[in-house]
């Protein structure tokens, strides 16, 4: 007994620190991934808040035409954004000490790169921390696997896409209208709506919402009756009560009759695996689609696919989308180039007479 006490007393400061970091008894689990997650996410969050409020305009296109994104420079919550790093910087690592001055760093959009790189490191560590806590508690690792879907999506738009396009200026701005601008330009340049992986992502997100609503409403409606046939079932149930009221047999019977027998799960684990896997796989595919379109492997092109016997084009929905894409493309970065790439790359049509 004495030897054990001596060993505890002689435990080093480092040993006590390790035990505290990896203890699952803490109110909030830290873990070794948390040691990196906490400072990176705090840095990204604090710089985002400061830059969103007060950052000066950024020369995003590298043509000496700064774009304002902060609240103090005339924006509101909807129009405000952290403007991406300048095209003049490209993919160069651009910390503060690489600039001649802080003013130059701000003018070239240094905060965007700082926020994005810290944020991606932070959310990756959050995913690792989920696995680490699951491991400490003897759980299975699927929580972290599910979280990998939004991590992959964020990595695709903030890192993979800029790498493929050759500049952080092509990354998604950190703001509401900036996000929509990114989506519109992405459609114009890559025809993402005609990409099968994006279609799978839409099915994953909308399907996941539908299944979540169906599951929640079904569980809430499946009561173990606490009342007689002569009074409402609601009388035996208090909204939000802690005691379980869910009966999977009743839910299975209801849903099997509403649609058909095999559309309903009678196994709770199979049901919840499906609820988790459907949106996760869909978002994985979307992230993969963004990552391939980053290198210009774009959505399907069915432009002018249908012609009559005289060779005249019969417009289809694909041609309508193509015209919309061209319109969006000529509107963005309108001072950076005279023609969008699609228009500049083709030969001029020949004229008769």
UniProtKB/Swiss-Prot annotation:
InterPro entries: D1/D2, Photo_II_D1/D2_sf, Photo_RC_L/M, Photo_RC_L/M_CS, PSII_D1
Top EC group: oxidoreductase
Binding-site residues for [CaMn4O5] cluster, renumbered to this chain: 170, 189, 332-333, 342, 344
Subcellular location: Plastid, Chloroplast thylakoid membrane
Residues the UniProt record annotates as site (Tyrosine radical intermediate): 161
Pro-piece positions: 345-353
Any one Pfam family match given in the protein's UniProt record, by short name: Photo_RC
Entry binding sites for a quinone: 215, 264-265
EC number: 1.10.3.9
Chain positions found as Phosphothreonine: 2
Gene3D superfamilies the record matches: Photosystem II protein D1-like (1.20.85.10)
Cofactor details (free text): The D1/D2 heterodimer binds P680, chlorophylls that are the primary electron donor of PSII, and subsequent electron acceptors. It shares a non-heme iron and each subunit binds pheophytin, quinone, additional chlorophylls, carotenoids and lipids. D1 provides most of the ligands for the Mn4-Ca-O5 cluster of the oxygen-evolving complex (OEC). There is also a Cl(-1) ion associated with D1 and D2, which is required for oxygen evolution. The PSII complex binds additional chlorophylls, carotenoids and specific lipids.
Modified residues (N-acetylthreonine): 2
Reactions performed catalytically: 2 a plastoquinone + 4 hnu + 2 H2O = 2 a plastoquinol + O2
Residue numbers binding Fe cation: 215, 272
Sequence intervals crossing the membrane: 29-46, 118-133, 142-156, 197-218, 274-288
Example of a GO MF term: chlorophyll binding
Keyword annotations of the record: Acetylation, Calcium, Chlorophyll, Chloroplast, Chromophore, Electron transport, Herbicide resistance, Iron, Magnesium, Manganese, Membrane, Metal-binding, Oxidoreductase, Phosphoprotein, Photosynthesis, Photosystem II, Plastid, Thylakoid, Transmembrane, Transmembrane helix, Transport
Residues holding chlorophyll a ChlzD1: 118
CDD domains assigned to the protein according to its UniProt record, in alphabetical order: Photosystem-II_D1
Residue(s) at site: Stabilizes free radical intermediate: 190
Classification via NCBIfam families: psbA
Comment field (misc): 2 of the reaction center chlorophylls (ChlD1 and ChlD2) are entirely coordinated by water.
Quaternary state and interactors: PSII is composed of 1 copy each of membrane proteins PsbA, PsbB, PsbC, PsbD, PsbE, PsbF, PsbH, PsbI, PsbJ, PsbK, PsbL, PsbM, PsbT, PsbX, PsbY, PsbZ, Psb30/Ycf12, at least 3 peripheral proteins of the oxygen-evolving complex and a large number of cofactors. It forms dimeric complexes.
Designated name of the protein: Photosystem II protein D1
Source organism: Petunia hybrida (Petunia)
């Amino acid at each position: 007994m004495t030897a054990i006490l001596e060993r505890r007393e002689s435990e080093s400061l480092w040993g006590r620190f390790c035990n505290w970091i990896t203890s699952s008894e803490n109110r909030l689990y830290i873990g070794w991934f948390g040691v990196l997650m906490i400072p990176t996410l705090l840095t990204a969050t604090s710089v985002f808040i400061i830059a969103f409020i007060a950052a000066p305009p950024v020369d995003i296109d590298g043509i000496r035409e700064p774009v304002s994104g902060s609240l103090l420079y005339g924006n509101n919550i909807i129009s405000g954004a952290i403007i991406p790093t300048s095209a003049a910087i490209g993919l160069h690592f651009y910390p503060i000490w690489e600039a001649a001055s802080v003013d130059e760093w701000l003018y070239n959009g240094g905060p965007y790169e700082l926020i994005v790189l810290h944020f991606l490191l932070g959310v990756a560590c959050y995913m690792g921390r989920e696995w680490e806590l699951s491991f400490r508690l003897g759980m299975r690792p699927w929580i972290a696997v599910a979280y990998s879907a939004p991590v992959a999506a964020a990595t695709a738009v903030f890192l993979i896409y800029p790498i493929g396009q050759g500049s952080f200026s092509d990354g998604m701005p950190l703001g509401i209208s900036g996000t929509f601008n990114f989506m519109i330009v992405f459609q114009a340049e890559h025809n993402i709506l005609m990409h099968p992986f994006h279609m799978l992502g839409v099915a994953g997100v909308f399907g996941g919402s539908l299944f979540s609503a169906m599951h929640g409403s079904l569980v809430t409606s499946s009561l173990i009756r606490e009342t007689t046939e002569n009074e409402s079932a609601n009388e035996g149930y208090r909204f939000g009560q802690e005691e379980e009221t869910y009966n999977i047999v009743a839910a299975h019977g209801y849903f099997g009759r509403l649609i058909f027998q095999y559309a309903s799960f009678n196994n709770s684990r199979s049901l919840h695996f499906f609820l988790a896997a459907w949106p996760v796989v869909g978002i994985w595919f979307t992230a993969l689609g963004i990552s391939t379109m980053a290198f210009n492997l774009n959505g399907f092109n069915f432009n002018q696919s249908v012609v009559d016997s005289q060779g005249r084009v019969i417009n289809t929905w694909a041609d309508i989308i193509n015209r919309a894409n061209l319109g969006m493309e000529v509107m963005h970065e309108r001072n950076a180039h005279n023609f969008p790439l699609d228009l500049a790359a083709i030969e001029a049509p020949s004229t008769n007479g």
